[in-house]
Amino acid sequence: MSRVGKSPIALQGAEVKLADGVITVKGPLGTITQAVNPLVKVANNDGTLNLAPADESREANALSGTMRAIIANAVHGVTKGFERKLTLVGVGYRAQAQGDKLNLSLGFSHPVVHQMPEGVKAETPTQTEIVIKGIDKQKVGQVAAEVRGYRPPEPYKGKGVRYADEVVILKETKKK
């Protein structure tokens, strides 16, 4: 059996409903619904969720670990939320959050406007910092990757958009 799939999920104040193959996780920050694969059995035991493969196949075993991780992320998201921090490095690189849009000045001849998907918010504590928050880990990571993709850090000076915890290894310039 999957090692990840064996461990129970503590609900930490989240409310879980399971109905015809769909699990709904509700918490103080919002609600996430997720389809549960029929190869995985979900049992709700007062305050914890246990997942087990429905049969002994390799696919069911693998899916039990995957579903456990997805549901655990949903529980964490609706109780505490997820956030990704980005830093802009470079002269004139700026970010400004305006409602559900993120305006970026990244050295192009035009400003880059990124539309935030539903359930994801962007904040700019300073002009060179972006904090992306939401309850869905996948969406938060996807938006952060899209924003970073507009101007990834270049290897010689390190200019660009990078994750706050990212270490950019700089190359040495060509010697004569």
Curated annotation (Swiss-Prot):
TM segment ranges: none
UniProt xrefs under SUPFAM superfamilies: Ribosomal protein L6 (SSF56053)
Pfam families: Ribosomal_L6 (PF00347)
Keywords: Ribonucleoprotein, Ribosomal protein, RNA-binding, rRNA-binding
Gene Ontology molecular function, alphabetical: rRNA binding; structural constituent of ribosome
Domain of life: Bacteria
One GO cellular component term noted in the UniProt record for this chain: cytosolic large ribosomal subunit
Function: This protein binds to the 23S rRNA, and is important in its secondary structure. It is located near the subunit interface in the base of the L7/L12 stalk, and near the tRNA binding site of the peptidyltransferase center.
Homology family: Belongs to the universal ribosomal protein uL6 family.
NCBIfam families referenced in this protein's UniProt entry, alphabetically: L6_bact
Subunit and partners: Part of the 50S ribosomal subunit.
UniProt name for this protein: Large ribosomal subunit protein uL6
